[in-house]
Amino acid sequence: MPKRRQKKYFTSLPDDPQPIVHEVRHRLAFSEVDALAIGWHGHYPEFFEMAHTELMRKIGLTYDLYRENGIGAPIVQLHADYFAPLILDEFFTIRAELVWSDGARINVNYEIIKENGQLAGTGYTVQMLFDAYNHTPFVTTPPLVESVWQRWKNGEFKDL
């Protein structure tokens, strides 16, 4: 059987700021496995969210700040590919990579990496930014997010 393609979903253009990366280590819990003690595929979005939340917290975009600024950021696309099983009690790393976008959206690539370095899964999410009060999409990036994007362009997140 041919090897499935293991790729990045979003890529940067030459003039874009470098992606911002954050990793979270996690041990697969009993509540996260199926009857065969293998990580249940339905938990992968939760794993993605663990790394995503910490990455966004590090750059100053928390869910509390979204609410305070009237911003909604629902996931409108979620994709996952599975390459190797995670086993009960196994440690693994979830890697989130925020990739630059000029639009009012947030693009994040994910990798789930086993302790031995083997890639267990990859995925991505797309979040669209909208006005939380009238539920309409933002045509331009809202000021809170734009201020963080400006800091990103200025290179403030290189050492995260």
State where each predicted segment sits.
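Hydrophobic beta-strand-centered segment that forms part of the acyl-chain substrate-binding groove
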Residues: 55-106, 120
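Hot-dog-fold acyl-thioester-processing enzymes
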Residues: 2-77, 131-160
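A glycine-centered beta-loop-beta connector
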Residues: 116-118
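Residues in well-ordered beta-strands of folded domains
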Residues: 27, 81, 126-128
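Extracellular and select intracellular beta-sandwich modules with Ser/Thr-enriched
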Residues: 22, 121-123
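Core beta-strand residues in small-molecule sensory/regulatory alpha/beta domains
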Residues: 111-114
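Short loop/turn microsegments at loop-to-beta-strand junctions
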Residues: 107-108, 125-126
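Short hydrophobic alpha-helix segments
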Residues: 123-125, 141
